[in-house]
């Protein structure tokens, strides 16, 4: 586990890959499964993602369990080189909510090199979009190769962008070995339960 025995799950990935949409789908499912959840949304200069998430989770999470962190620099700075602001936000959560089970940490949009400091995230999910091209998995990058779970999101767009999901599946297996990959469509809520299963197996039941 991590900070004061609360599990921390980091979600990283390029701009537009669907990280915020994924958080919106994960929180109600984790809540329904009986977990007490907090959310931290990182961005460079704004609180927009945090504000949208807070509105989305009305009636599910108390407003003060959704926090925005403005990194003021490259997105990976706040999750890797200097995670102190995120760690402080987690500590504030656990002081107010000692029964908190898990905190989801959404990174600002970055590139394929984005990873989380292990002092910050117990479990790392890297989200890519089909719209970025079906060659993304084989381009590797630390996010793709080092994540505990790779999520290939926006599968509904595959026929519109000439992306081959089987190619992406094959390439993900080649570059990640036995590490898991999930294919999701957040809009249709497809594949989200599989992501929850991996979170439970990877960190909540660990």
From Swiss-Prot:
Primary residence: cytoplasm
Keyword ATP-binding: no
GO biological process: urea catabolic process
Highest taxon, organism lineage: Archaea
Cellular location(s): Cytoplasm
Disulfide-bond pairs as recorded: none
Keyword tags: Chaperone, Cytoplasm, GTP-binding, Nickel insertion, Nucleotide-binding
Pfam families listed in its UniProt record: cobW
Keyword Cytoplasm: yes
GO molecular function: GTP binding; GTPase activity; nickel cation binding
This protein's GO CC annotations: cytoplasm
Binding site for GTP: 13-20
Family of this protein: Belongs to the SIMIBI class G3E GTPase family. UreG subfamily.
Subunit and interaction comment: Homodimer. UreD, UreF and UreG form a complex that acts as a GTP-hydrolysis-dependent molecular chaperone, activating the urease apoprotein by helping to assemble the nickel containing metallocenter of UreC. The UreE protein probably delivers the nickel.
Function: Facilitates the functional incorporation of the urease nickel metallocenter. This process requires GTP hydrolysis, probably effectuated by UreG.
Protein name as annotated: Urease accessory protein UreG
Annotated organism of origin: Natronomonas pharaonis (strain ATCC 35678 / DSM 2160 / CIP 103997 / JCM 8858 / NBRC 14720 / NCIMB 2260 / Gabara)
Lineage: Archaea, Methanobacteriati, Methanobacteriota, Stenosarchaea group, Halobacteria
Gene: ureG
